Amino acid sequence: MTTFTNARPKTTPQRGFRASPDRPLALLARCPVHIETPMPELADLAKTLGVAQLFAKNEGKRMRLGSFKALGGAFAVAQMICEAAGVEDPVAAKETAATMTFVTASAGNHGLSVAAGAKIFGARAVIILPSTVPAAFDARIRATGAEVIGGQSYDDSVAQAIRLADENGWIHLSDGSWAGYTARPALILEGYSVLSAECAGHFAALNTWPTHVFLQAGVGGLAAGVAAHIRDHWPVQPNIVVIEPDRAPCLINSMKAGALTMGDGPDSNMGRLDCKNASLIAFEALWADADIFVTITDEAAAQAAATLAAHGLATTPSGAAGLAGLIALAPAADSRCMIVVSEGSENG
């Protein structure tokens, strides 16, 4: 385990995205399969871990897509269709949508969200899956009607998506960002603020707020989107802890360096977090919003997934990374902790 404490003075960051859920919630209000995901308290596990309380936001059934990513890619597709058509309702823009093809590389869940959004609103999607992505994602994405293309590594697949977009006049919709490419990923992070807003409503009803929030990171979108909403909207501020695979420590390396830095290493069993390059807008936001960065081993993530399964929450090492980070950090006995079970099992 490696840790990094962000001792920089916290200031209101000039974020490259909106940390407000109003627009995605307006879209979700018209979605018949949208319901707030549960956040059970795991009292027995909290006792075992030696903390006061443990809440687990369970994204495994999010809109039948199996992860928090359902909130981001589909919302971005809808917003871009609306912008292209000059309307506010994507359902009223079917003719415009039919002319649009969205292409992205994905470790699985983001591609599924983009593909589902394209299907719902009448566009076309092409998803490039790296060779390490489980076959179950290929089948689920194809079931939406999207075209799936096999790629090599994640970074190679991103480059392939950019090339195909340029060659065919398609719309590249990555959940990562870099200099000159931030507006589209910003829509995805805006969608993720819904998750944090739901948690805030839950804690307000309990009149109990966490002292620690553990957020796993690949390129950093979930961590940045949720952390930004917490900083802007929660009345009681927690310590925000960002967890990465020790085989893909792009954010912790970047925080230490003070600039975006690659996190190279062998493949991780945390497939959805196995990203070697962080998102620019996520890095910039977490620079101000996050308190602690932690890396975890593949073995720790696998054990955390088994522990959650034993408590009725089926997930993967990626989905259990927050719990693994909590166990590694071992906060004080009076800590009230929140984790995000970011995805269900790989088979849906």
Per-region residue spans from a language model:
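PLP-dependent amino-acid enzyme catalytic core
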Residues: M1-G348
